[in-house]
Amino acid sequence: MPTCVSCGRELQPGGHPDNICPECRAKAFVQAQQEAKANRPSLIKLMPVTSTIIGANVLVFLGMTLSGVSPTAPQISDLVKWGANTGAQTLASQPWRIWTSNYVHIGIVHILLNMWCLWSLGALAERVFDRWTYFLTYTFCGIAGSLASLGLHPNRFGAGASGAIFGLAGALISAFYLGHLPVPTRAMKSTLRSLVLFAAYNLFFGAVVPAIDNSAHIGGLVCGLVLGAVLARHLTSPPDERNSWRQRVFMVSGIVLLAVFFLIRRYVVHV
């Protein structure tokens, strides 16, 4: 009588594929499922930068809510306390607000919409850019959006990740248009069209809704278009060459943003 090749148990007549008893076959199936689950990459591994940025935004929002800030209709004073951008404080002695304001949101609807947009764009950005290029592009575009808002509306407050998100869209538009990426022409045209429509629709929406700070959107978008265009030439270069170029690009960009901040600080009048 044949025996199971796994456990040595005698097999009943009737045929058993590969000479494995039902019990061992069931155990092997369960073990294979567990191994597949263990080896399956998590979202954090697949989208590390996007997951980290979204996690930071959610943590700030939870911190605000747990401290007593309304999750649906927060007061301006609470938003400013948590790092919103406002001319009186940002230009006086708290310049870090041009960065922290990108992680402060005006209620749950605001953060949900922004994080949904970031998740959608981030899935693409993780494939086009390396991690540092993605994160620095997002950060610098967010700062550029804050500076645009500060320069044009110094007496208003600003908060939210939309400037950085517009910047990410702009960088992707430039990368797909100028970067010679190894993407089929049809897919590239379709992606470009979707990115342009995303930016155009949201700019139009921002123009017709008075409460939306479209200057931050435009500032972030322009910064992203420029950064993406400058970075595009080395997106497919060898790692050492790409990293060297990235360092130079963001060093110069940082100096430019710093100079813009001091120009606004000197010439823009705020109450």
Please give the residue ranges for each predicted region.
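A detector for small-residue-rich transmembrane helices and their helix-helix packing motifs
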Residues: 2-271
